[in-house]
């Protein structure tokens, strides 16, 4: 991993990652798995055996017109102008071990930034629920989210996610094991809950213009 992300290589991931074709053969490259207003998300393998995946997001630098288009609130416009995607990476990096994806690297390149992170092979909670999981599995997933938020609060009392909904919780299959929580034990039922998307989060000593300036109150988000 360190060799892959070293130096200029990190600015051209598609030339160094591996992609498995439908016929099973391997080639250099990555596949796009998502796209937002300011960036595209890709997945690739770090070895030619495709035993481990990595995800990276290429973030273009938006122009002023792109940032402020259809945004009538002056304060919200200013916040978007100041917002740095690296802030979200930094928050997630500090929360490693608390049920969030592992962050690998934030690389500033020519005309774009690239964020490398762990690939979470799972489904959004709202989609996972459509497959009618068992009552034990549903209880376990909810407990995992609550437990990890509790653990985060113990270490970082000032943390607030501010945007924790069914689309920002991923559920992935894992080996069955027991979870101990405040004197109680419950099975994970073969699933792990992963909290994502910290773009609206508040974190001690990390400035988030969307939250620190109270602009979230104007866009339907409350503490």
Located regions from the model:
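Activation segment
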Residues: 61, 122, 172, 176-177, ...
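ATP-binding glycine-rich phosphate-binding loop
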Residues: 5-48
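Conserved kinase catalytic-core helix
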Residues: 132-162, 166-167, 172
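C-lobe/activation-segment region of protein kinase-like
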Residues: 184-223
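ATP-binding glycine-rich loop module of kinase domains
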Residues: 30, 38-94
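Activation-loop N-terminal segment of eukaryotic-like protein kinases
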Residues: 171-177, 182, 188
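Conserved structural core of kinase catalytic domains
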Residues: 67, 79-82, 87-89, 93, ...
């Amino acid at each position: 991993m360190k060799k892959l992300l070293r130096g200029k290589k990190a600015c051209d991931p598609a030339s160094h990652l591996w992609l498995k074709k439908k016929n099973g053969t391997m080639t250099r490259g990555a596949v796009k798995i998502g796209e937002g207003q300011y960036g595209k998300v890709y997945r690739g393998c770090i070895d030619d055996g495709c035993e481990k995946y990595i995800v990276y997001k290429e973030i273009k630098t938006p122009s002023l017109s792109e940032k402020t288009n259809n945004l009538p609130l002056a304060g919200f416009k200013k916040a978007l102008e100041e917002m740095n995607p690296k802030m979200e990476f930094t928050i997630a990096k500090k929360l490693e071990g608390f049920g969030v994806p592992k962050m690998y690297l934030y690389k500033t390149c020519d005309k774009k930034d690239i964020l490398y992170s762990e690939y979470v092979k799972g489904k959004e909670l709202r989609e996972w629920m459509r497959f009618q999981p068992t009552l034990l599995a549903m209880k376990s997933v909810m407990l995992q989210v609550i437990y990890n938020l509790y653990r985060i609060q113990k270490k970082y009392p000032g943390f607030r996610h501010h945007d924790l909904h069914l689309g920002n919780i991923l559920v992935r299959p894992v080996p069955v094991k027991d979870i101990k929580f405040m004197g109680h034990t419950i099975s994970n039922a073969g699933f792990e809950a992963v909290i994502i998307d910290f773009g609206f989060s508040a974190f001690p000593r990390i400035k988030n213009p969307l939250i620190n300036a109270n602009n979230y109150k104007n866009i339907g988000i409350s503490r």
